């Protein structure tokens, strides 16, 4: 996803309030844990993109930020929502550097849920863990990890170790954790 970002002034409340009233989202771009720039993103463009994303996919989505003539690859590290309207009111981006590893949550997607043996026998499929915390280089980031539940029977479980993890991705979450279970109704 490509976003055009503009530089903004300081963190004064009055300035940030005006940015939001004009249809912008204040954001901070970090690099190596240090603040690189205060920027503004068009709220309509970001919200339109956000509405097309699958639940949980924002954590592993790589953005290309056009900032002052540079193309910066970044991940959303933090997102803040308005309490009542649930509008996005602030974003934090972390710049991705090719040779530096990054920690992130990659969503787990269950596949073949319709063909699951346990569900066909009247069971209920329950996904216990929805993300896997991993460490990888920016080039190895994947949008999601797949867990095939087709052969899962009644009262059976699949663990994180049952997920085929692509090369270059190192899990931080213990692999003996239960990811999916089929329970009797």
Swiss-Prot record:
One of its GO terms (biological process) is translation. GO terms for molecular function: 5S rRNA binding; structural constituent of ribosome. The keyword Plastid does not apply. Pfam families: Ribosomal_L25p, Ribosomal_TL5_C. Keywords: Ribonucleoprotein, Ribosomal protein, RNA-binding, rRNA-binding. HAMAP family: Ribosomal_bL25_CTC. This is Large ribosomal subunit protein bL25. The gene is rplY.
């Amino acid at each position: 996803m490509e976003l055009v970002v503009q530089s903004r002034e300081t963190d004064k409340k009055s300035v940030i309030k005006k940015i939001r009233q004009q249809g912008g989202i204040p954001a901070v771009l970090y690099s190596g844990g240090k603040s690189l720039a205060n920027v503004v993103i068009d709220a309509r463009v970001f919200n339109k993109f956000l509405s097309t994303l699958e639940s949980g996919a924002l954590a592993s989505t790589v953005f290309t930020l056009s900032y002052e003539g540079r193309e910066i690859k970044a991940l959303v590290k933090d997102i803040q929502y308005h309490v009542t309207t649930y509008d996005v009111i602030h974003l934090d981006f972390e710049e991705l550097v090719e040779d530096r590893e990054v920690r992130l949550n990659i969503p787990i997607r269950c596949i073949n849920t319709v063909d699951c043996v346990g569900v066909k026998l009247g069971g209920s499929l329950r996904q216990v863990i929805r993300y896997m915390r991993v460490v990888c280089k920016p080039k190895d980031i994947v949008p999601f990890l797949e867990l095939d539940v087709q052969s899962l029977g009644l009262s059976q479980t699949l663990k994180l170790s049952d997920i085929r993890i692509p090369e270059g991705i190192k899990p931080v979450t213990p692999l003996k954790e239960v990811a999916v279970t089929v329970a009797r109704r």
